[in-house]
């Protein structure tokens, strides 16, 4: 009998835990089970602490706090054995894992649709011969870049920058007044901003506001990708279909974006919704089609 140890095959996927929506939903006894999902990503042999791979580089510097958080090493044996860090609002390494998992998931959906690898828009560099395109290997991701209620893609930095802020006392729902809300822990916000970067890589001129609809296209496309990503998690889909009895035109989480963020800045519900909105009394109403609305709207998010 041979005493040789059989070779262990390389895994196909890396499993990482993340929030399906926002951390706040895990406080609800009837929502916490579907709000924590396990994302499967293609196995990367060269993944470095950060995480850093062939597509993105997570850099966790916090300028407002003058802090730099230790990079997550997702190759640690203990983390591999338990699908990464458990979801946590207070652990910076989970924040790094969360943005990495959602950014890579969004990239994967783009590549599946396009049938090719995704590329970032090149960096324009002024040389003695004029402006030249310089290849951008990795998109940088900063989970704690801003101490404000904001998140955005920077075409100049080729980076995603996420903020954190204190929840408004006027906000409702499960937020506590003054608690810290992290944009990097919102699945919707991360997917939305990643889409801006991917769309810029597909067509760099779409980042230039040559007319009122260019930025609106960016915002609409990013919202649609974030919304459709909800439908890729079977447990979430089953739950919301059951709660609405199949009437997905009624209020449900599948049609809403950035639920916690919206409440934290003082709104009754999500930051944006594809289905309806709350009035001044806090009552939700389904949005009625209005062909004239586009003529009254110029702000990119609302127009998109």
Segments from the language model and where they lie:
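Glycine-rich, mobile lid/loop segments that gate access to catalytic sites or pores
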Residues: 194
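Acidic/polar low-complexity interaction segments
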Residues: 1-104, 108-112, 120-123, 134-137, ...
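Zinc-dependent metallohydrolase catalytic domains
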Residues: 103, 107-121, 128-159, 163-191, ...
């Amino acid at each position: 009998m041979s005493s040789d140890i059989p070779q262990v095959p390389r895994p196909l996927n890396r499993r990482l835990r993340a929030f399906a929506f926002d951390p706040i939903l895990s406080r609800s006894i009837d929502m916490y089970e579907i709000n924590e999902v396990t994302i499967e990503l293609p196995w990367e042999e060269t993944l470095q602490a950060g995480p850093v791979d062939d597509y993105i580089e997570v850099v966790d510097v916090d300028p407002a706090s003058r802090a730099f958080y230790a990079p997550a090493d997702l190759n640690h044996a203990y983390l591999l054995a338990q699908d990464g860090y458990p979801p946590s609002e207070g652990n910076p390494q989970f924040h790094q894992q969360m943005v990495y998992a959602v950014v890579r998931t969004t990239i994967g959906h783009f590549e599946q649709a396009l049938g090719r690898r995704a590329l970032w828009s090149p960096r324009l560099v002024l040389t003695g011969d004029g402006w030249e395109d310089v290849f951008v290997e990795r998109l940088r991701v900063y989970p704690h870049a801003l101490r404000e209620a904001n998140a955005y893609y920077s075409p100049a930095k080729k980076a995603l920058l996420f903020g954190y802020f204190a929840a408004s006392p006027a906000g409702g729902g499960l937020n506590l007044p003054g608690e810290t809300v992290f944009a990097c822990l919102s699945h919707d916000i991360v997917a939305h901003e990643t889409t801006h970067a991917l769309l810029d890589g597909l067509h760099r001129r779409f980042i230039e506001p040559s007319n009122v609809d260019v930025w609106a296209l960016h915002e609409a496309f990013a919202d649609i990708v974030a919304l459709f990503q909800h439908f890729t998690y079977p447990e979430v889909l089953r739950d919301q279909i059951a709660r609405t009895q199949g009437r997905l035109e009624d209020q449900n989480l599948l049609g809403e974006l950035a639920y916690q963020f919206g409440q934290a800045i003082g709104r009754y519900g999500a930051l944006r919704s594809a289905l309806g909105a709350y009035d001044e009394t806090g009552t939700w109403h389904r949005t009625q089609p209005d062909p004239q609305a586009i003529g009254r709207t110029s702000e990119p998010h609302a127009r998109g």
